[in-house]
């Protein structure tokens, strides 16, 4: 018998990633076992939470038209549908960006005592901030880190850029510390272009990290999850981008190849998987997490931890799952039942 009955898949977000989040959420909801669970789709954006669709076990999906979507009661995470109060047993969080990847949504569910699919509020907060996560992992003999510098909104951009180029050299990657889907990221080849790239990154948040570009042979990614007491790594993917790096166009407009399993040596594959398991354990992760890396002549470099990776038919994690021999439905059941 299933551990939970009423599963709320919550998607949409307050960030630039909200449309990607909707696609991930709808895909996830459609793949949750229709014979075991009642699935409810909750669209949440800027404080407005509405039930947009539901599918009772062994029944067809029912969508609610705009203007007639039941409002979710955030005091206890429930909803009234046709005179019946439904209190959700479990939250499957598919919000990319804020608040689903910032720790705020996890904190809400933890205060209510509602189990959810992702890491704790603390781990999510640390992992989502690129600079904080690197600082947390640095010096732990887990993986290499590219040299970096950080600037906060309000600080002198020109002075920062001059000092950063002098310290790190070129080329550089400029990133918002708390954004995903490659929003706000620029590769900088010339020193005179750095201030504009920093200002662009500030459109996505209050802090910007500038990293020295790593001369990499491979860009690799690995999904990790918990199954009972075991931390398991999925087959790894190599990303080959037509744009030179994995920007938004490469991710979502078909300008990249994502090869699974990655055509790299068994030694490198095992190193990526073991490193991913070690980081997962060290951070205290839960649910499905994706780790991204660059492989260079002098070792494996950490890029980021993705607490809520994309879950559409074309996303990387579903490719890993299928390559592992599992169906998406089987995998989602494992995540739900082990949360």
Describe each model-derived feature in a short phrase.
Residues 1-11, 15, 23, 81, ...:
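Active-site nucleotide/adenylate-binding loops and adjacent lid/helix of ATP-dependent enzymes
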